[in-house]
Amino acid sequence: SDVFIVSDMADSQQKYAMKVEKQHGNIRAVLKLDVMVLSCMQRRGVVGFPMMIAAGRTSAYKYLVMQMLGPDLGKLRRSLPEKRFSLATALKVALQTVDRLHALHDAGWLCRQRREGAKSGGWNDEQDNGQIYMLDFGFARRFRDTEGNLIRPRANAALVGTFQYAPLAAHAHKDQSPKDDLESWFYMTVELIKGPLPWGNFKDYHQMGNYKKAIRNEKRSDFLSGCPDELGTIMDSIDRTQFFEEPQYDLISREIRSAAARADVDLEMPFDWQIERWMFRRAHFVGDLGESNMASERLANADDSDNDRSSLPVDATPPLESR
């Protein structure tokens, strides 16, 4: 699907995001799932999911109009020289995103696409509300039916979502459950704290899967080095959870808060991009895989008198897939 910025005809200052998808010829139709999940969360009054304004179709296209949001977490993270957030921001994001997953699971849905695709709350730095929003549900799947009954796992399942964050169950072509969403969330959280994941440049998903197994054994200490000790407890809790078992969301949140307290981190402080306002501008120039040379040139010539950081070194090297 393609995304456009649109305005309210009655108020040109009111901006929205419109996702558009062809009626036919898509490799994978995703807009229907976006509408189903967002309308479900909207009916439940859950925070942290973009408000759906309108949805419909024409003879050629399907469309979804929704609340305009800011850059995704991946672009904000990659806008930084070290490609990682401060510990305070990483833990705040972790706390909010695990709450979003808990709400999604309570509604009977799996995300199956947990990556840094969650977004900040404003489409520019002045409108940011400190809220992290979850969106992009093209790979979502129900694990409970409409009566609330658990759906039996299939014998085989396709590997879907972003390989970097795929859980071990996905690598084994098994159906996923809420604990697998949390495993993907865990990889994302480590990346927010430390920077690109060690398997980020691997081309083969089997190789990625083998490395993910190794971090449970001989590579555990290397993988978790530089992270609060509490992350080891969180990983163990996720790994112990069985397919039909409810994950220990409360334990995970407690451990994140414990990590913050032990590191003397104030979880009420603003996000990095709310302090360093140049991050918003720079994130808009960062592509899905990295920062382009053209973006670097535009940033170097940019004029932003408010908290100007255009003189900072800009990474103009060819992007790595992990970035």
Go through each PLM region and give its residues.
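Short beta-strand micro-motifs within the conserved protein kinase catalytic domain, predominantly
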Residues: 51-62, 70
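Structural motif in protein kinase domains
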Residues: 69-79
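Conserved activation segment of eukaryotic-like protein kinases, specifically the C-terminal portion
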Residues: 152-170
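Catalytic-loop of the protein kinase fold
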Residues: 101, 105-129
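Extended, low-complexity, intrinsically disordered C-terminal regulatory tails
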Residues: 217-226, 247, 252-254, 261-323
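ATP-binding glycine-rich loop module of kinase domains
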Residues: 2-34, 39-40
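Activation segment signature within eukaryotic-like protein kinase domains
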Residues: 93-94
